[in-house]
A protein has these predicted regions:
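Charged, low-complexity interaction tracts
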Residues: 35-163
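Charge-rich, low-complexity N-terminal segments
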Residues: 1-46
């Protein structure tokens, strides 16, 4: 196994673990069902191999879902991004309330979030430094196995280079 293959294996494991955590923690207490399965958030997960390691890309609002958001009368992030994310969600899920326009439905949802907050669904743990082993606790066990594979791959490449 070469280094790139070992990194690809790690990237796949990270994506699989995040998806497993979404399945485990994705239940919305207000809706009573897992609203994260097959969601835009889940499909936004992209783990790629870079020269320096792996990179995780995920929808910008993941933090508000994972950490929740306390009722403060303020909105998470910028207002434009907040409205866009809610509008996209309403559109994707084809949410209708009587004869209300989509913009009116979006306003009702935003007002509800302002007043009631968002219950946390900790499919990932927030870490300021972006340390994946802190963000995804199950990853630690996998890292040990993966590191052995990576070390062996590096040693093989070193042997090829010097021999």
């Amino acid at each position: 196994m070469d280094v790139r293959t070992a990194l690809m294996e790690l990237a796949e494991a990270v994506k699989r673990i995040i998806n497993d955590r979404i399945n485990r923690y994705g239940v919305n207490p207000r809706a009573g069902k897992n609203t994260l399965q097959n969601s835009s958030l889940q499909s936004s997960i992209n783990v790629t191999v870079q020269e320096e390691g792996i990179t995780l890309q995920i929808a910008d609002y993941w933090e508000y879902i994972a950490r929740g958001w306390k009722r403060t009368g303020n909105y998470p992030g910028t207002m434009r991004l907040f409205v866009k994310n809610i509008n996209d969600w309403v559109s994707k899920n084809n949410i209708r309330i009587g004869d209300l326009k989509q913009s009116q439905i979006v306003w009702i949802i935003i007002k509800n979030i302002w007043e009631r907050g968002i219950a946390p669904r900790p499919f990932m743990v927030y870490d300021e430094d972006g340390d994946l082993t802190k963000m995804i606790p199950e990853l630690d066990a996998y890292i040990d196995k993966w590191f052995d594979n990576l070390f062996n791959a590096i040693m093989e490449e070193t042997d090829k280079y010097f021999n």
